[in-house]
Amino acid sequence: MYTRRVSAAAAATPMFTPHHTLLGPGTRAPAPPPVAGIPAAAPVPIPLPPGTPSISVVIPARDEARNLPGVLAELPGGLHEVILVDGASADDTIAAARRARPGIRVLSQPGRGKGNALACGILAATGEITVTLDADGSADPAEIAEFAAALTAGADFVKGSRYLPGGGSSDLTMLRRAGNGALVLLMNRLYRTEFSDLCYGYNAFWTRCAAALDLERIAAADPVFGDGFEIETVLAAHAANARLTVAEVPSYERDRRYGESHLNTWRDGRRVLRAILRERRRDPARTPRTRPARPSAAPRTVSKP
């Protein structure tokens, strides 16, 4: 398994126009707040670069009617499809999504939990690339082009990282930051990888690699481990166990626009810990890998079988 990191500075030509002003490594200025009495202008979709492979965007959602229209409006132009996986929303989530983006594919997840919704959407994707995106507005859809660029550069699976230079977050509490750091250390030690971020839902991969991620069980109606917020860790572990080429790109996590997060730090943190230990035991090969190399700005190999 190969793991690479891709930084924004490594690209000779920018692949998209940033929505934030860079202040330094890991920090960005948030978008200016709306002015009272003046309606916010609708974002202009940034088209994907010519030659980008077809992309399916999978968005799991439950009770996100207020957030989804803004997320869908920010998606880049030229996408192959957008798949909304609804988790039995009690609000106007589906209707709001269809108003904001006519032609959106809507699936109803058979089970419960974010992991179940993501697995269903991933298995239904028909584009060459699948991107997973949260429905709360915390991820910047303009970064999709950077994920696609890392895939076309040779990666099989790309994780967004809030901790690489150029990434950051306005939503991380000290507790979440410390917990993520401890879990990343454990993951890297057990899997001989060099992830910098683990509990972040912005990912992309070649759709042909979905079979290696072993999602059929998680997509079923019956409750199983992996169907909750631990899904991001399960995906990373399955990619590592399958010896996929994994890359990281810097990503900025914004504040949720409306409502409260369904994430519970302690409960879901324990589930992530369990996922790391459980999926390591399921590794069919468990072959030792060399120690990761030191970081560099360019794409690089940091571990080998």
Predicted regions, residues:
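Acidic metal-phosphate-binding loop of nucleotide-sugar-dependent transferases
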Residues: 137-139
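Hydrophobic targeting segments
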Residues: 53-59, 68, 75, 81-85
